[in-house]
């Protein structure tokens, strides 16, 4: 697949869990990239994500930008030594709407991950999602393991579950 060669040569694609599967990607599959609404606008750090989505789209692969309307209310613990200051729901929503508008201006399909959770209560979540989560696996993730020594809130621990489901 020419797009894989292109992304590899550009240094964008480095590690792929299953290269053969990626090379034979189903035409109905989608590749997504996540955007965190903790800032009012997209920033330079998002540039590679956007260009990669556009390159994949141009190569005929369906792409999707997922904006974290749900995960943005929690805050990503990755690469943090302390817990993020939580934004108000209004701030997250304002940021999310701005970022969605910016992504759509590139012609990128956008999905808000809040749609997965907005009508789900905690008991439904634990039954539907919690029963399939391996806590030992999560504790071994670098983003979690590094924070355990200094303290990690349940909110931050749950971020990975909400992001991944």
Segments and roles (model prediction):
Residues 1-165:
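NTP-dependent nucleotidyl-transfer catalytic core
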């Amino acid at each position: 697949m020419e797009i894989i060669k292109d992304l590899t040569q550009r240094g964008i694609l480095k590690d792929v869990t299953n290269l053969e599967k990626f090379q034979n990607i189903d035409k109905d599959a989608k590749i997504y990239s996540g955007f965190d609404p903790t800032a009012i606008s997209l920033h330079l750090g998002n540039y590679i994500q956007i260009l990669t989505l556009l390159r994949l789209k141009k190569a005929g692969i369906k792409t999707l930008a997922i904006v974290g309307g749900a995960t943005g209310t929690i805050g990503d613990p990755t690469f943090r030594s302390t817990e993020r200051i939580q934004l108000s729901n209004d701030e997250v929503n304002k940021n999310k709407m701005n970022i969605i508008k910016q992504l759509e201006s590139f012609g990128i399909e956008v999905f808000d991950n809040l749609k997965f959770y907005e009508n789900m209560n905690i008991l439904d979540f634990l039954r539907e999602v919690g029963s399939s989560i391996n806590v030992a696996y999560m504790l071994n993730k670098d983003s979690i393991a590094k924070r355990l020594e200094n303290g990690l809130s349940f909110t931050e621990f749950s971020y990975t579950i909400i992001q991944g489901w």
